[in-house]
Amino acid sequence: MNIIAQLEAEQCAKIEAKRQLPKFQAGDTVRVMVRVTEGTRTRVQAYEGVCIARSGGGLNETFTVRKISYGEGVERVFPVYSPLIEGVELVRRGKVRRAKLYYLRGLRGKAARIAEKRVYRKKDEKVAERVQATAVTVDVAEQAAE
């Protein structure tokens, strides 16, 4: 590993220690908390929209968020490791088959909607959750008996 890549990895780790971002990709609706300075006041502003692209790598990684504001499409590019980003909330996952959703720029209204991705559980997971829930109930019952 060369020196520059090593320094970038250290900086990424340092920033990730302060705040954790959820794993999201193109098609997901996200709410980005951005620190905005107006004169002497500083406040946190939420910017909610569809992530249409992720690009770059390391410290230079960015993601583009598109939202419709007063009937106009507005896109904003955020660096992942920017100190101005307080956090990112994942609002919903989208079902798309592309990594870059630039085609949404030409669509309006219902045509620009993205279907929500459904997460299906396997039978084993439900059984494991039930077993864990019963174990907790039994523990509580034992503590109450004592």
Swiss-Prot record:
SUPFAM superfamilies the record matches: Translation proteins SH3-like domain
Protein's UniProt name: Large ribosomal subunit protein bL19
GO MF entries: structural constituent of ribosome
Organism of derivation: Bartonella quintana (strain Toulouse)
NCBIfam families the record matches: rplS_bact (TIGR01024)
HAMAP family with a match to the protein in the record: Ribosomal_bL19
Family classification: Belongs to the bacterial ribosomal protein bL19 family.
Ranges in coiled-coil conformation: none
GO biological process assignments: translation
Keyword terms, alphabetized: Ribonucleoprotein, Ribosomal protein
Cross-referenced PANTHER family: LARGE RIBOSOMAL SUBUNIT PROTEIN BL19M, RIBOSOMAL PROTEIN L19
PROSITE patterns on file: RIBOSOMAL_L19 (PS01015)
